[in-house]
Design a protein with these regions (language model features):
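Phosphate- and other anionic-substrate recognition elements at nucleic-acid/protein interfaces
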Residues: 1-5, 9-135
Length: 135
C-alpha cells in the first residue's frame, strides 16, 4: 500500500492506493491533524511507502514524519510541478459537472472544494509510473 501526501501549511491531501492502482482512501485534512491521520492510515492499510510532493513544505514534513511516526516507512519525494492544474482536470473527470455547469469550459471551472487529496493521488501515480519505467 502506498500513501500519497500533499503537504501544505494550512491543509494536506492524503490518498491511499494499492500497487494495482486501486484507490482506497482520499481526504483533505487540516495540517494540524495530518500526522495523526497518517499514523492511523499506516495502521489501517499497512502502508509500505509514503510518496510526498517535493515543493513548499516538503523538507520540514519529511523530517517531522521521519521523527514522529511510530512506524518506519520509506518516504519518497516526487516532482509535484503542475500537479494542482492536473488535479483540477482530474476532479472534473471524477465528479463531472451537472446541469448548467456543464456549459462552462473546463478550463474556467473551479472545483467547489479543496483538491489536495487529488494531488496526493496524482503523486502516487507519478511514483508508480516512474517505478514501472525503472523496472
Amino acid at each position: 500500500m502506498i500513501l500519497g501526501f500533499d503537504p501544505g501549511r494550512d491543509k494536506c491531501g492524503l490518498a491511499v492506493m494499492g500497487k494495482e492502482r486501486q484507490l482506497l482512501y482520499h481526504q483533505v485534512v487540516v495540517s494540524q491533524e495530518a500526522l495523526a491521520t497518517i499514523q492511523q492510515l499506516c495502521q489501517d492499510y499497512a502502508i509500505e511507502t509514503i510518496v510526498m510532493g517535493d515543493q513548499t513544505t516538503a523538507k520540514s514534513w519529511e523530517q517531522k514524519l521521519s521523527r514522529d511516526l511510530s512506524v518506519s516507512v520509506p518516504i519518497i519525494l516526487v516532482d509535484e510541478r503542475y500537479s494542482t492544474l492536473e488535479a483540477r482536470d482530474r476532479y472534473w473527470q471524477m465528479y463531472p459537472p451537472q446541469g448548467l455547469k456543464r456549459l462552462i469550459p473546463q478550463g474556467m471551472r473551479q472545483p467547489p472544494r479543496p483538491i489536495d487529496d487529488i494531488v496526493a493521488i496524482l503523486l502516487i501515480e507519478r511514483y508508480l509510473t516512474l517505478g514501472s519505467r525503472g523496472s
